[in-house]
Each structure stands twice: as C-alpha cells, then as structure tokens.
Amino acid sequence: MPPSGRFDRTIALAGTGHLKIGNFVIKETIGKGAFGAVKRGTHIQTGYDVAIKILNRGRMKGLGTVNKTRNEIDNLQKLTHPHITRLFRVISTPSDIFLVMELVSGGELFSYITRKGALPIRESRRYFQQIISGVSYCHNHMIVHRDLKPENLLLDANKNIKIADFGLSNYMTDGDLLSTACGSPNYAAPELISNKLYVGPEVDLWSCGVILYAMLCGTLPFDDQNVPTLFAKIKSGRYTVPYSMEKQAADLISTMLQVDPVKRADVKRIVNHSWFRIDLPYYLFPECENESSIVDIDVVQSVAEKFDVKEEDVTGALLAEDHHHFLCIAYRLEVNHKRNADESSQKAMEDFWEIGKTMKMGSTSLPVGATTKTNVGRKILEGLKKEQKKLTWNLGIRACLDPVETMKHVFLSLKSVDMEWKVLSMYHIIVRSKPTPINPDPVKVSLQLFALDKKENNKGYLLDFKGLTEDEEAVPPSRCRSRAASVSVTLAKSKSDLNGNSSKVPMSPLSPMSPISPSVNIPKVRVDDADASLKSSLNSSIYMADIENSMESLDEVSTQSSEPEAPIRSQTMEFFATCHIIMQALLAE
C-alpha cells in the first residue's frame, strides 16, 4: 500500500491488485515521460480505456516546468477537436497530478515516417489536412502550439492524426506579441530562433510546412548537426526540392516556408490551395464549429442507464458545462469511443460536427453522416426499413454549394467545353453546343437548379438535366440573357478574384433560405416569379451581376467553328451526348 495521504483519492481494488483513482482503474504502464509514468486506465462505469498521465509535483518543481504543465492543462481543457488529444479529467493529489486523456494507440508520426520513409502522396495529404484542421481550430481559440513536430503528432488505431503535447503552447491576446524562443530547432520558424517578436500562428504554419516536407520526402528541409549552421539554413529559407516532388506540393510548401512571416501563407491560403483541396473532407473545415450545443441522445440514454440516473440529470450536467462532473466525463468518453471505434472513422468524425453533407458536384447518393447526430448510419437504415414508402428519388447532380457558387461553377464548366447558353432566370439556363455547318441547329438542354425538399431530410440542391418544353422554347430573346465565348473576360475576372479556385469552391451546406427555384415537390412555377424572387435574395457583391451585364443575344452569336464533326444519328442520342459532355465538365477536377 502507498504511504497514507499520498493518493488521497486512491484505493486498492479488492482481488485485482490495481489502484483506483476517481472512477478510473489504473493498470499497466504504457509509456514514460519526464515527470512520471503514463498508465493505461479504464473507466469503471463505461469500461472504456484511457491514458492516465501521472505528473509528479516534486519533479516538475525541480525542473521548473510547473508553468509548462499548467499551460498544457489549461489549453487542452479548451479544445475539443477530432484531431487533438482529448483531456477528460484532471485529478490532483498532494504529490501528483493525474491527467485522464484519450488513449491514442498508433504511436508517433515520427516513428511511422522513420519506419516507412517517404509517405505516399495521398496519405501525406490526408495527414496534412487533419493537422491543418487541428491547428486552425487551436488558432481560432487563440491558442498557438509552438512545438509542432512529428514527435508530437500521434496516430490512432484508424491512422488519424491527434495533435498532442501542448506544454509549450500559449494563449494569444489581441494586440500582444510573443517573444519566447521555444520548440524544436529543425521545425522552428526563423523569427522564433532569432528572438524576434511574433504573433503566434505564423510559427505553427512554418512548422506545418516542415512536417509536410518530411512526410513527402522522408527527410527534413533544414538539418545539420551543428546548431549555428542549422539556424543559418533556417534563416536563409533555402532548401532542396526533390525532383520527384509534385509541383503543386512544392508550391504549397514554398508558400509556408517563407522567411518573412508577413509573406507566409496563412490557414485560408493553405486551405484554398489546389493541392490541399484534393479529397478534402468537409468535416475538417465546417461552417459551424460550435459543437457544444449538439447532444447525442443515444449517448445520454446510455450514460443514464449505466449510472442509474435520469436522462435529465445527464443533460443538466452537460448544460451546466461542468467538465469535471462525472456524468460529463462519462458522456465525453462514450462520444469519443463511438467516433474512434467506427470502422469508417471518417464518417464518424463528420458526425462530431453540426454539418449537412460531405458532398461534391456529382455525388448521387446520400452519405452516412448527413445529419447533426451521431450514429447516423444505423438510424438511416432503421428509418428506411420502417418507412419504405417515404423514400424519395432524385435524378441529377446534387451539390451543397451556395446556389450562386454552384451556378458560377456551371458557367465556368460550360465555358471550358465551349458551350453556349441562354439565361431564362438566375438558376435556369438553356445550353447547346456551338453550331457547325454539319449541325447548324444543335440540340438544346435545359439546366435548372432545384432546392431539395427539406421535409424529406434532403439538404442542398439538384442540378436537373432535361429536354426543352414548349414554354421554354417560346421565351422571346428580349426576355433572355444569352452569352458566348466573348464574355470570357467576365468569367476570368470572377475566377481570379477567387484565387483561381472558382471551379473548386468547397461544397458547404447553406443556412435556411427561400427555395431558389421550384421545389422538387412543386414543379410548376412562372419564370417571372422565380426570377424576381431570386434576384431579391442575391448579394450585390456576387459576380452574377457581371455575367448578366455581359450577356448578348444568342441570335447574334458567331457560328464560327473548328473542324466539322460527324453527324449524330438522332436528337435523342445527341441530347444524351450533350448531357454527357456537360457532366464531364462539371465533375472535372
């Protein structure tokens, strides 16, 4: 037995030999730190494993690291992100501090790179996206890490990144600059090792650039056994780019490893970079990061049953925001376990955020993780079994873009394949290929953007393809705005204003708004009414106004063409061929 008073909240469990502190059983040692051991622990009521970091007070005081530990605890308690290690509880005794943390079993990213060498591009990008998401979350909560390196990036059982070790982190105050030189030399920014003042986020992003280089190359951009020589290399900002590195990846790294922090890429620039956006999961950068208001009812019920309390007691503890309340701790453990234990962990982590759908142009199915509650896959399947008759089918291309951004994407895509179009309303156009001597009257396709019926749990919009109706054919030119390749200056202007990423705007769910065109369940609407209601809802800064002013009559379009094409057998075949060309353009990266 330990000396009396040493573990004032610890008792021996009868017949097991293990010690208990609070609601946790302390088991075997799984690691060692500078201030004590790291033990595996188990939450008694839920049975979930945790990591218990034991910090010896005397050792911390002797090494002068009390403030470092206090920073880590204070900052971790503020952070709740799927790619940052969770701190569930802090238990203090006269001699030790016990940090009950998320158990991350996959080891360090550093060991992983050392073992495998340069990582595949796709894997590196996935890790980097998760790192930037976590770092951005920290910065949004006014916390700068200041010691980002592969040794402080852990991998969980599903090979997801977990940012750890916030001991050198600091809380940022508006208007204040930091001056402490800290962090690991190989990953430290020039201003940090030069004892210059810095705001904070820029030093983390420099470190992220070094980490990305290390993942792609298996080596460091700045390395030398002699520290003064190493510092000189870092301050010069010169490093070798391997011939095998992708140009876009090299370009992104170069924007992050800028010696001048003013010129260094910020999070927004990184996220909008074309290399970074490939296969970017929506949950990493959601519109709403306020997950504190989301309560998983299933978990509330489970916790209430395990502790033999009412569900109101659990929700009351959550609303009181008492993070050390035993019901809050059990709730967070349950939620964390559900997210990490799911085989498709990406979708499970998406449920962590209050989001609509992780959708891209061209997605034709409803993904699991499409609502604001966790365990959605099971609920969707159960709902389909119970309500087979309520199943709704949609034919077309679904998107969760802002409707105006969707139409900008459509216009740019049509321009890329040299199509012509006539605008019936802001979200309804007629499209055709350019006339040729062989085919002077190409078949026309009607493209219309519909708001999906929210009553059927559908969110987002549907771009519908159809043949022309008589009413659409009869609309006089005076009531339409048409456009040809001569308006490319307007589109180029919009594209440049969007940093060249207009055609790859992130698909994000919208806040509630009026239907932008007939709902899928209300197909009839007059063009005038739809046009008027839509114009009133548009923001004046949108480039659609520029596109409108540049429209010319379709009758005046030049019919100059390149080499004549072979005639198409029928109007039906030509219609589907035109639709195929448009879809390919819309779905092109």
UniProtKB/Swiss-Prot annotation:
Catalytic reactions of this protein: L-seryl-[protein] + ATP = O-phospho-L-seryl-[protein] + ADP + H(+); L-threonyl-[protein] + ATP = O-phospho-L-threonyl-[protein] + ADP + H(+)
GO terms (BP aspect): cellular response to glucose starvation; negative regulation of cell population proliferation; negative regulation of TORC1 signaling; nematode pharyngeal pumping; positive regulation of autophagy; protein localization to lipid droplet
Keyword match Nucleotide-binding: yes
Knockout-associated phenotype: Reduced survival as a result of hyperosmotic stress induced by NaCl. Double knockout with aak-2 results in reduced glycogen accumulation.
EC nos: 2.7.11.1
Protein kinase domain span: 24-276
Keywords noted in UniProt: ATP-binding, Kinase, Nucleotide-binding, Serine/threonine-protein kinase, Transferase
Active-site residues per Swiss-Prot or TrEMBL entry: D147 (proton acceptor)
InterPro entries documented for this protein: KA1/Ssp2_C (IPR028375), Kinase-like_dom_sf (IPR011009), PRKAA1/2_AID (IPR049020), Prot_kinase_dom (IPR000719), Protein_kinase_ATP_BS (IPR017441), Ser/Thr_kinase_AS (IPR008271)
Stored CDD domains: AMPKA_C, UBA_AID_AMPKalpha
Gene3D superfamilies: DNA helicase RuvA subunit, C-terminal domain, Kinase associated domain 1, KA1, Phosphorylase Kinase, domain 1, Transferase(Phosphotransferase) domain 1
GO molecular function: ATP binding; protein serine kinase activity; protein serine/threonine kinase activity
Sites where the protein binds ATP: I30, G31, K32, G33, A34, F35, G36, A37, V38, K53
Gene Ontology CC, one term: cytoplasm
Role noted for this protein: Probably does not act as a sensor that couples lifespan to information about energy levels and insulin-like signals. Together with aak-2, involved in the establishment of germline stem cell (GSC) quiescence during dauer development. Plays a role in the maintenance of glycogen stores which are necessary for resistance to hyperosmotic stress.
Family the entry assigns: Belongs to the protein kinase superfamily. CAMK Ser/Thr protein kinase family. SNF1 subfamily.
Matches recorded under PANTHER family: MAP/MICROTUBULE AFFINITY-REGULATING KINASE, NON-SPECIFIC SERINE_THREONINE PROTEIN KINASE
Protein name (record): 5'-AMP-activated protein kinase catalytic subunit alpha-1
Source taxonomy: Eukaryota, Metazoa, Ecdysozoa, Nematoda, Chromadorea
